[in-house]
Structure formats: structure tokens, C-alpha cells
Amino acid sequence: MTRVRMVTGGPAGAVAILLAIGAPSGATAKKAAPAPATAVLRIYLARHGQTDWNAEHRLQGANDTHLNGTGRAQAEKLAARLAGVHFDAVYSSNLARSRETAEIAHGGVPIDSLADLNERDFGKFQGFVVGSDSATTAEYERRKDAPGDDLDGGESLEQHFARVRRALEGIRRAHPTGTILIVGHGLTNQLILRDLLGLTWEKSNAISQANDELYMIEVGGGRAPRLWKWIGPENLKDL
């Protein structure tokens, strides 16, 4: 069951969409790390700023690319949004574009870079510009969401999800309560939401997050997880 409502008063005058998402019908609830029943963990989930490869619609995956000028401006905007938030910890992947975004946005908290939060290795498609060749694009679109397909020497969704879950388990053991920031990647963040919200592959594959969009997930407290998506005033037309 999903409920949606508008919430005001977010960081820097942003507007949030609140999605209250329960476990899928018939699903078995997963046990969180041991914590008091009233403990709540708030996870701010950002995507890294834009890179040249993002602008070119090129699959960068495990390639270690850096922010471009637009990406640095997006990271500065993220810092402004988060200016009033105290973080107990900040996590990034160990790819430069994620670390650079976290360094600009973190507000002085040391950054813990985890390889398990890295983007998926897209195998034979890494570096491919989606749409540049119709046959290759069709093959990629056909294969990318199949959970067991490693894309010819890359990484399957199942393998990627296993390491993302491993990262989250460690993070939640270290922080059963409090407020943390994770700066990840487009697909990595899909899988973080899949794990925290108990989503199916179909539902998690449908999630999109632009380079300048921010989620906040609240887990614990003896209730179903809740998800907010902050959208800056200039993006309200997209609602």
C-alpha cells in the first residue's frame, strides 16, 4: 500500500513528496539491526552530481569519472539544502564522482567511502552511449533489468544488490538511530530503496533519481518505512 501527500518545510524551502510504503502483500518483513522499538534512523539519500558521461548519456558504471561544472554546482545546491541538518555519519562510494559530491555537501563530517556502494559494472555496455546504436541499445534495454544477467563480464543486479545490502547492514549496525547521509549512484540508490522499503525488482527498477534530487527515508520506530523526495521550487512543474 502506498500513500502520497505533500509536505512543506523541508531543507532550503523545498517541497517534499511523502510516500508511506508498507511491505508488499504476502511478503515477510525483514529484521533490522537490534535497536529499541522507538529508535528511528533517518537516511538522506543523494545521487552524485553530473559528470561529462552523464551529460553524454554514456554508461559509466564502475568507471571512475569526476564531476563536471554542472555537477559541482549541483553538489553546492545539495550542501545548501542540507545546511540545517546535523549528520551523525556520511557515506559515499569510493568512486570519485560520489566522493566529490559528498566532500562538497557533507558539512564537515568525515566521509566513510565504501566500495560496496559503487555503481554497477555494466560489462560489455560500459562506456556505451545509450541510443547511439539501435541494435546495441535494444540489447542493453532487454538485458539490463534481468536480475541474473552479468552483461558479459560485468555484474548482475543480484550481485550488485548483495553488496549494497552488505553495506546497508553494516551502516545500520553502526547507526541503529540518528541521521546519516549516503551519496550514491543511480542504480545503487534504486537498490538501497529496494532493500529498505521491501520492493520487488519491478518496482525498484522503475525508480529514477536525477543528479540533483534527494530522498529521505525514515526506518524504525515500530512502523513501516517512510520515504520523502525533496523537489526544489524550480522543479514543481514536474509534479
Across the structure, where does each feature detected by a protein language model lie?
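Acidic, low-complexity terminal tails and accessory targeting/binding regions
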Residues: A27-L41, R120-G131, G178, R194-L239
